[in-house]
């Protein structure tokens, strides 16, 4: 290929710690290694110290990031389109952030195809998204639930299931000695991992945003009920989150009210590189996510790659992580209730709630397992990740998608198979 395929990405900054940023980075790096692509990224959704153009010594002009506020605007996009003339526009995250983009899709798609990497948490089928889905040339879906939803609402739009990936060379099982040293490193300052008998405590890990759907407060209350069963010195819960997130609960107030301030619940509030996060998963005996809605659930995915079993709600992308339909890699909790919630933007969607007693029972079941049983679950979990979410294979899928779109649909002077208008007969 004489000319490299130039892709413009919109979304979270590729170097940010968010799940969207992480996946964007994985995809860009995977495509750059083929030698066929160049990327210009509008990196948003974070507070920037400066707005200088970012380049990388390894990639030169083939990967440039322009920091922006929010996710951009029509004016910014028009300017970038004129200045860089991308062959493909790729964007990712919740549909509610892209109304401004789809509003001018007839203008943008006339120049280059639009690829939407989409997540949707649950059914009933979101028919209210139909106008959004049909404003794209291709939709990549991150979970099987998302894929079914898109195909149910807009079967005429080209779509394909392309799940998330993890860097299995970072998120992996570390030697026991290295994990032990990490426990005493002070990363978790309140770290008291030994019970009254001098034995190692059982450690649960929770790595999520402190937000309502993540059930952060419920997790603490349920963990306290679990401690009431097994003994308050027998286990600890590490919560990697912002305890004062304005979208969540005051978690410090909760543990104070429950009287569990002696190392039972420990907060990890700093932002860490992937290597440190991987060690946190290794430190834990089990990672838990009982959110009532979850598009994919990157934390439990990373946990499985580190051979740490999981407890999850059977919702969204979590349900395809905890089991492959035959084997289980932790404990999956079926929702005890399904409520239809919504808003003015999203009129309906299921909210999958789990019962507190079932969560506590699952915690106890994981706690009562032998170490060998948990290790077996963990090994199977990593094999599930490597086999069914193989990074190299998924990068091949992205390469195939981008190459086909470039060849079949073209861009700018060679744009094909798109009309910015349609003819309707008016009686």
Please give the residue ranges for each predicted region.
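Carbohydrate-associated surface elements
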Residues: 145, 165
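Short N-terminal targeting/anchoring amphipathic segment
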Residues: 78-98, 113-115
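Nucleotide-activated donor-binding/catalytic signature segment of Leloir-type glycosyltransferases, i.e.
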Residues: 64, 248-271, 275
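Aromatic "clamp/platform" in nucleotide-sugar-dependent glycosyltransferases that forms part
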Residues: 292
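A short, well-ordered alpha-helix in the C-terminal region of glycosyltransferases
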Residues: 358, 365, 373-387
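Conserved donor-binding/catalytic core segment of Leloir-type glycosyltransferases
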Residues: 8-9, 190-214, 220-223, 237-238
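N-terminal subdomain of nucleotide-sugar transferases
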Residues: 1-55, 84, 424-427
């Amino acid at each position: 290929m004489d000319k490299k395929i130039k892709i413009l990405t919109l979304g979270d900054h590729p170097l940010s710690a968010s799940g969207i940023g992480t996946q964007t980075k994985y995809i860009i790096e995977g495509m750059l290694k083929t030698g066929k692509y160049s990327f210009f990224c509008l990196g948003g959704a974070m507070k920037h110290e400066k707005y200088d153009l970012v380049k990388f010594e390894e990639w030169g002009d083939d990967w440039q990031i322009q920091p922006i506020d929010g996710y951009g605007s029509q004016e910014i996009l028009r300017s970038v389109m004129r200045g860089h003339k991308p062959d493909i526009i790729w964007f990712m995250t919740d549909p509610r952030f892209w109304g401004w983009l789809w509003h001018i899709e007839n203008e943008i798609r006339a120049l280059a195809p639009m690829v939407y990497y989409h997540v949707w948490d649950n059914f009933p089928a979101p028919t209210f998204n139909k106008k959004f889905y049909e404003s794209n040339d291709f939709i990549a879906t991150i979970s099987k639930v998302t894929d079914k939803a898109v195909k149910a609402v807009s079967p005429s739009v080209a779509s394909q299931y392309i799940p998330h990936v993890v860097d299995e060379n970072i998120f992996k099982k570390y030697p026991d000695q290295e994990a032990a040293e990490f426990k005493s490193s002070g990363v978790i300052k309140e770290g008291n991992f030994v019970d009254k008998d001098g034995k190692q405590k059982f450690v649960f890990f929770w790595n999520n945003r402190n937000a309502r759907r993540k059930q952060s407060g419920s997790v603490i209350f349920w963990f306290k009920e679990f401690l009431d069963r097994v003994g308050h010195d027998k286990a600890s819960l590490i919560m990697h989150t912002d305890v004062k997130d304005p979208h969540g609960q005051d978690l410090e107030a909760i543990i104070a009210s429950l009287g569990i301030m002696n190392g039972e619940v420990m907060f990890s509030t700093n932002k860490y590189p992937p290597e440190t996060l991987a060690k946190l998963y290794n430190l834990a005996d089990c990672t838990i996510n009982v959110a009532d809605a979850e598009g994919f659930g990157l934390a439990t995915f990373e946990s499985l790659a580190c051979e740490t079993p999981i407890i999850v709600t059977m919702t969204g992308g979590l349900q395809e992580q905890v089991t492959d339909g035959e084997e289980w890699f932790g404990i999956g909790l079926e929702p005890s209730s399904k409520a239809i919630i919504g808003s003015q933007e999203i009129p309906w969607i299921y909210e999958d709630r789990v019962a507190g007693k079932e969560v506590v029972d699952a915690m106890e079941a994981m706690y009562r397992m032998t170490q060998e049983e948990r290790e077996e679950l963990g090994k199977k979990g990593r094999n599930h990740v490597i086999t069914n979410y193989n990074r190299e294979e998924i990068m091949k899928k992205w390469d195939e998608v981008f190459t086909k779109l470039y060849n079949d649909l073209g861009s700018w002077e060679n744009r094909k198979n798109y009309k910015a208008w349609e003819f309707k007969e008016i009686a």
